[in-house]
Swiss-Prot record:
Family: Belongs to the UPF0246 family.
Name used for this protein in its record: UPF0246 protein FTW_0267
One BP annotation, GO: response to hydroperoxide
TM ranges: none
NCBIfam families (alphabetical): PRK02101.1-3
Domain of life: Bacteria
GO cellular component labels: cytosol
PANTHER family xref list: PEROXIDE STRESS RESISTANCE PROTEIN YAAA, PEROXIDE STRESS RESPONSE PROTEIN YAAA
InterPro entries the record matches: YaaA
Length: 254
């Protein structure tokens, strides 16, 4: 069983004290190609491309121009699971997971990324900003199409080493489209979270993101390897709701 989640635009590069064996990014050649493209963008072009403020565009410009794709160590990079800092990761709270759970996560959790493709928890990453939906082309393909065959091939290779061949999709649509479901030789299971508002159940972005992190933590801490145990998730008021679920989707409501 492998979980996939989205990355986060917010990143924390404060040093941490750990004794983990960090790993290098999976797709180094592709990262070099992408970062070289990004380095050609001036501040004003970044602002338009990423639809961000001038100040933020300057920060992104600086990040990409200081990026060294040939060097990943503690001086310029940090393990991904401790770096991403958005709502999903606030639910995950990786810095409070014990060592054995982090080591388990290394083989059961993957983060999708516009720049890195697939990221394992202990892969070292440098500061960047490149959402999967960004309107750039590489080798004549839009970004998620560029990554699709590479990510899917790598996932199939990882699943060849897994006993339970189920992909738990806790990523957003923007990122999960970088996986070719038809070419993935495993079961695909989506998970959704809904809130009861005035008698109607709705998926609310900020709550769903944090819940994805909570679910990721639940699966990792409990070493869950089957769907029936996922249904037992009962955190932050969420419970499995069969009325909104089917064989390819588990929905949890509160």
């Amino acid at each position: 069983m492998i979980i996939v989640i989205s990355p986060a635009k917010s990143q924390n590069f404060e040093p941490i004290k750990t004794a983990y064996q960090f790993t290098q990014p999976i797709f180094k050649q592709q990262i070099i190609k992408l970062i070289n493209i990004l380095k050609h963008y001036e501040v004003e072009e970044i602002e338009k491309l990423m639809k961000i403020s001038p100040k933020l565009a300057e920060e992104v410009f600086a990040k990409h121009n200081s990026f060294n794709p040939n060097k990943y160590d503690n001086s310029n990079a940090k393990a991904a699971i401790f770096t991403f800092n958005g709502d999903v990761y606030k639910g995950l709270e990786a810095d409070t997971l014990d060592n054995k759970t982090i080591e388990y996560a290394q083989n059961h959790l993957l983060m999708l990324s516009g720049l890195y493709g697939l990221v394992r928890p202990l892969d070292l990453i440098q500061a960047y900003r490149l959402e999967m939906g960004t309107n750039i082309k590489i080798d004549g393909k839009i970004l998620h199409k560029y990554w699709q065959d590479k990510i899917t091939t790598q996932l199939n290779e990882y699943f060849s080493q897994q006993q339970n061949k189920i992909l738990i999709n806790l990523a957003s649509n923007e990122y999960s489209q970088a996986i070719d479901k038809k070419s993935l030789a495993v079961k695909w299971l989506d998970i959704d979270f809904k809130e009861n508002k005035a008698g109607a159940y709705k998926t609310i972005g900020i709550h769903a993101k944090k819940a994805r992190g909570l679910m990721t933590r639940y699966i990792l801490e409990n070493r869950i390897e089957n769907v029936s145990d996922i249904k037992k998730f009962n955190v932050a008021g969420y419970q499995f709701n069969p009325d909104f679920s089917d064989e390819n989707l588990l929905c949890f409501t509160r």
